Amino acid sequence: MKLLSYFILLMVAVASCSKKDNYDPPQSKLTGAILYKGDSIYLEYNRVPYQFYQYGFGKLGPVEQTFTQSGVISSLLFNGNYKFIVPNGQGPFLWPKTSGGGPDSLDVTVNGNQQLNIEVTPYYMIRNANISASGGNAVATCKVEKIINDANAKDIEFVGIYINKTEFVSGANNIANAGKSGADITDLNNISLSVAIPSLTQKYVFARIGLKIAGVEDMIFSPLVQVSF
């Protein structure tokens, strides 16, 4: 009799585990981008996180992912109500805070595939970026627009040009870079940069201009371009 009881308990436990393991995975795809007045904000790959917290499931941890280097959001979620946040200290932009100093949240209702574009205020934007090859160098020009001018304003630490053999281009992913410190930039409307292209078997590189803000960990970038030479 005891053996039969143990067997029944074992079957109940196995059935319970199987039920937990057989939930369908999330099916709803939420896509979108982080923007400033409709313009994309370009970031470093796998660098700036965002989080979804779902209502009604106790104290579960967030669903955390990172923006792409084009500032794109792409997440598979269960249908339901979520809070979307960017953690404090992340991103080259201001994210709203609560009165307690934590990151404020955006309410998001997911019901099937949908799009979510999020407007934020960056410290700076790189405008009119142009990058080309000349004399064995990648040369770039751009304009920098200062967006935040109040008590939250921050200085430019440096502006640089970055090139790489692949489409992942940043301070951490490059084969060559060169830049100017903020103190050496005299005209935000006319910034010129140049970096020597190393000897390569391929006849092109990918390039972006990046701007480092003083006191902010994450850089903001120009759109990715392919430069042939």
Task: Label every PLM stretch briefly.
Residues M1-D39:
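Bacterial Sec-dependent N-terminal signal peptides
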Residues I34-S40, K143-A151:
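Short amphipathic, basic-aromatic surface patches that mediate peripheral association
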Residues K37-K59, A153-I156:
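Short, ordered, surface-exposed loop/turn motifs in non-cytosolic proteins
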Residues Y55-S70:
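Short, acidic Ser/Thr/Gly-rich low-complexity loop/linker segments typical of extracellular
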Residues G89-T121:
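Structured interaction patches on ligand/partner-binding surfaces of diverse proteins
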Residues V195-M219:
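Beta-strand-rich modules
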Residues E217-F229:
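Short beta-strand elements
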